[in-house]
């Protein structure tokens, strides 16, 4: 239901609150003032909010139903095929209904309770929003060398898709490639010196180094790479004080 008044509440079934996160509690309060029938289950679609966002409706079964998928625009129902849907509910009956709904659209239900919600949603941001951020930064770098945005995006997307395919086949640790995985400190140093905004690279590289060590990177090579990353930080700070 949209964030508006003038609607009539159904006597039973499920009412989904398809509103921004910041409007969920307000909408719950407005619905509570309408005295909803006790048989009506009320469900929000937020990935970040727990069931406490619906606390104004404590007389009703309350739930959450969050598809772990990106919806920047209307998408075909096939977008639900094989994805995970995070579900939670205040009653076993509503939980069963939400699980059944997830399966009906081709998804896999997974219980995610209030205590897990914040980290669950942060993980979703990493796997979706931050991928876009990193690709946008890569496009920006290529544009700085004379590429158009279209050329850069077209060239980079197969690389992104290949990385995702490797993760699907081998998992995130074994799929890591590149200079960090090889412990190529010299290349890392050249990158840092060339970048106009090296902090993002440095932050991601340090996390990548942890993954590379799990994948079996030689400790000596890992040490050289870490020194290259941290030494550049110290040099940058010294230049800034001059």
What are these regions (language model features)?
Residues 1, 59, 76-169:
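Internal alpha-helical scaffold of NAD(P)-dependent oxidoreductase catalytic cores
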Residues 216-242:
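NAD(P)-dependent dehydrogenase/reductase Rossmann-like domain
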Residues 2-76:
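Rossmann-like NAD(P)(H) cofactor-binding subdomain of soluble oxidoreductases
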Residues 165-221:
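Interdomain hinge/lid region at the active-site interface
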Residues 22-23, 49, 92-93, 133, ...:
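Short alpha-helical
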Residues 49, 55, 151-160, 210-218:
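Membrane-interacting alpha-helical segments
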Residues 155-159, 204-207, 224-228:
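Short acidic/histidine-centered micro-motifs embedded in hydrophobic/aromatic stretches
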